[in-house]
Structure formats: structure tokens, C-alpha cells
Amino acid sequence: MRLILPADTEGIFLERKSRFTGVALVEGKKTLIHIHNTGRLPLLKKGKRVLLKRAESDRRKTGWDLLAVEHRNEFVFVHSGFHSIVAGKILEELFPGSTIESEKRFENSRFDFLIDRRTFVEVKGCTYEEDGVAMFPDAPTGRGRRHIEELIRSVKSGFKALLLILVFLESDCFLPNRSVDPAFSEIFWRALNSGVNIDVFRVKYDGEYLCSTEKLSICEEV
């Protein structure tokens, strides 16, 4: 998978003002930027280099969108608004010739994709790691737990289900983040044992392209 998404400029991150806004030094000026990610993003620290894309609308209070933040000699893509686009490209390669529909409803939930009317897909983006282990979530996520519960229910109803996890930073393998959200970790393993397929893909960003480089394994839980 290769998706072109060039950054428009580079800046220096200064602070996170709220859930969706931050301040960065852009072209020598303190500038309000939009952070399209509801996670805690612990790697987003003062002084870090960031890649930004100019906002398409002049009516917004924030003139720039945060795309990526520097972390250990690479840029980690943090804009969750592109997760579905990246996932769609990966699914096209995983299921060539299949019909892939987006935003499909099952009972009281809406999943990211439905493949050939029989496989529901939910996508999660991971931007946190410890000692080479990618972990999700970086903050408690009731919504994430509900999505996986619904994937399990879809399997019990005769569908197939896939949890697709996109890891955006250098990692050796993946684990659910038990220390941050024990309930999510519990339901993750329950899903794996209930017939939900879980695929983890490493996605790199170089300021020009998003590229899916390899499939990661699920670590052995200690």
C-alpha cells in the first residue's frame, strides 16, 4: 500500500491547548493547529518537529492540520482522519476483486467496512509503543471496547469479522494496552478467541507517502 500525502510545511510543537488544538511554531510564528486525534499522544511533546498540512477551509480557526510528529528519528503519522483511507487501500490488497463498502451498519453499531457483504472490518490506529511493543489504546476507550464487542456479536450472527490495526511507529509486535485500559485488553483477547481475525500492519510516513511495509505479530502477553 502506498498513498501520496505530502506535508506542506514543518514546524516545532509548543503545547496542546485542548483535545483538538495545539500551538506550533510555523514559519517563525506561534500558530494554532488542529489535532485530529482523540488519544493522549504522549509522543507529542514541546520541542518536537511536526509535519503540517494547510487547512482547505479559510473559515477555520486553525490554519494547519497536524499530520505527523518526530519520534526516534522517524515521523509518526497521527492524523486519524486518514485511517479509513489507508485501511481501504490495504483491504484492496488483502481482498483483491472483492466488493468493499464503507460505513456499514450492524445492529446498533456502524463498522468502518463491509467486504463482500459478509466480513465486517473495524480499524484502529496505534501511535504508542513501549520497548518495541506497539500498544493500543493510549487512553481509555469505551467506544473501542463497544466496537470489538459488536465484532464478536457479528461472528455469533454468522458474519466474519476483522479488526485491522494500523501501527504508525517502529515496533516489533503489538499488544492491547492493559495498563491503560484493562477492559479493552480483556475484550481484545476474548475477540481473538471468539473467531474475530486480527491483522496488524506497520505503516510508515516520510512526509510524502504513507506506506504499509510489513505485517506485525501479536506479542506473547507477559
Swiss-Prot record:
This is Sugar fermentation stimulation protein homolog. InterPro entries: SfsA, SfsA_C, SfsA_N. CDD domains: SfsA-like. It comes from Thermotoga maritima (strain ATCC 43589 / DSM 3109 / JCM 10099 / NBRC 100826 / MSB8). Belongs to the SfsA family. HAMAP family: SfsA. The lineage of its organism: Bacteria, Thermotogati, Thermotogota, Thermotogae, Thermotogales. GO terms for molecular function: DNA binding. Pfam families: SfsA, SfsA_N. Transmembrane segments: none annotated. Signal peptide: none annotated.
